[in-house]
Amino acid sequence: VATGASIIDMDFFEALGFKHYQGSQFENDAELRKNYIDRIYDTYIDEDELQICDKKICEIADNLEPKSYTSREFIYEIGRYLKENSVKKDSLIETAFDNNVPIFCPAFTDSSAGFGLVIHQEKNPKNHITIDSIKEFRELTEIKIRSKGSGLFMIGGGVPKNFIQDTVICAELLGKEVEMHKYAIQITVAD
């Protein structure tokens, strides 16, 4: 699975028991900010709850060996955390963890989890984890090279879509002959 930042901003957030609220894209952002409400287009999130989510991400990172991780490796650790601590069961992350399905999030810092990792690195300036997107792209390309056939399941567009589609080209640049992906499913909200 290749996804955008929504995997953290929505799935992890809701697995912790928090909710998103339907709002309006026309609301005054300054007024929302005064009330500590974040707006993602027409969806509202309580900033206090979002910061709890960020602190949980920091806590997960604090308990890992300080080294470079791919987003897949870190999301797997989030899944492990949710297995023990989720309020709302059967989130996408927890289900992927249970079934050993890799989730790649190439724009990881575009999510609120990026704030959690900044807090983690600030607390641990010399010994912290990092998310290595190049290592991640190489890992996904190696999966493509080893596969007998592949299909794509994409949540969102932009970076994750390009990221997973480009594994064919990257494999070719590494001197490997691979087939194109056999199918693609994309879930997105297009205006």
Protein language model regions, located:
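Conserved catalytic alpha/beta core of Sir2/sirtuin-type deacylases, generalized to analogous enzyme cores
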Residues: 1-191
